[in-house]
Amino acid sequence: MIKPSKLYAQLLTSRIRTIPFRDFERLLRAFGFEHDRTRGSHQVWTHPTINRPLSIQPSDKDAKRYQIEQFLELVEQHGLYMSE
């Protein structure tokens, strides 16, 4: 397992967007997202300051690239920061 701060830095500097799903969940929590509910393989995560849920699901054991991109866009658009 990689620290959320190091993982986030790697995502910002690397074009590779494949990370283990469990690490992605840890990264979401580090930015203040909370797991709201699960339907089938889809998990819905919410943030107290954002009025838009983020739906994620694993692709095998990794997070899906487009969902990582959506997360990074939300962080940038809403000025979210990590709390460790």
Regions found by a protein language model. Name each.
Residues M1-R22, R26, A30:
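A charge-rich, low-complexity, intrinsically flexible signal that marks solvent-exposed coils, linkers
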Residues P4, L12-S14, H47-T49, I56-S59, ...:
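Preference for short coil/turn "hinge" residues that link or interrupt alpha-helices
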Residues L12, E34-D36, K61-D62:
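Short alpha-helical segments used as structural interaction elements across diverse proteins
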Residues T18, R39, D62-R65:
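Short, well-ordered coil↔helix boundary/capping segments
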Residues L27-Q57:
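A short, structured beta-strand/loop element
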Residues S59-E84:
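C-terminal structural segments of small proteins and small subunits
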